[in-house]
Amino acid sequence: MLQLHPSEIKDIVLNGGVIAYPTEAVYGLGCDPDNDTAIQKLLAVKQRPWQKGLILVASEFSQLVDYVDESQLSAEQLEFAFSKWPGPFTFVMPIKPHVSRYLCGEFDSIAVRVSAHEGVRALCQALGKPLVSTSANLAGEDPALSGDEILNAFEGKIDALVLGSLGEQRQPSTIIDARSGKILRNGQ
C-alpha cells in the first residue's frame, strides 16, 4: 500500500482509487464522489450497504454545490450551516437529481461537512472537489486510530494511506438535518 502526503494523492483518487486518511477524530476511507466504481469498491472494502449513504467532506462549501440542491434550503438554513463550518458539524442537505445513489443511498439528501482538519482540507484542495468520507473500519467495528491499524486492516484492499495526524477531536461530528434543524447525532 502506498503511503503518501495529501498533495501526492490526486492521481490515485481521480483514477478510481480508495484511500485511507486521517480526519478530525479517526481515520477515514475516501474516494472520488463522481466515480461509481470507486464508491462501490469503498463500500465493498467497508462491507457497508449502499442504502445507508455516505458523507462528502470538503475544504469549502463551493466544492459541494454540484451535489447539494441549495434551492430547497432557505437563506437562514444555509447561514446556520455556514456558521458552524469549518468544523465538526455534518449537515444533511437535499441532493441534486444527478447525484449517485451510491452516495445518498435510499435518501433524497446527502450528509456534507466542511472540515477544519488541515490534512482533509489539503486533500480536497488538491482534488478540487469533495471527497467521499466514511470511517475506516468494517461496518459495526471500531474505526482505525493509527496508520498501523490501517495497514493491518486494509493492506491489499485500498490503494493508499495518506500520511498525517489525527485531529484532537475524540467524538464523531454532530449531524444536523439542514431542513428541519433537528440534531440526528450529538457529537462534539
UniProtKB/Swiss-Prot annotation:
Q: According to its UniProt record, which reaction does this protein catalyse?
A: L-threonine + hydrogencarbonate + ATP = L-threonylcarbamoyladenylate + diphosphate + H2O
Q: Name one GO molecular function term.
A: double-stranded RNA binding
**Cellular component, GO, one term:** cytoplasm
> Is Cytoplasm included in the keywords of this UniProt record?
yes
Which terms does the UniProt entry file under GO BP? regulation of translational fidelity; tRNA threonylcarbamoyladenosine modification
Q: Note one Pfam family from the annotation.
A: Sua5_yciO_yrdC
What PROSITE patterns does the record point to? YRDC
Top-level lineage group: Bacteria
Cited HAMAP family: TsaC
Q: What NCBIfam families has UniProt attached to this entry?
A: L-threonylcarbamoyladenylate synthase (TIGR00057)
**UniProt name for this protein:** Threonylcarbamoyl-AMP synthase
Q: Whose protein is this, by species?
A: Shewanella sp. (strain MR-4)
Q: Which gene encodes it?
A: tsaC
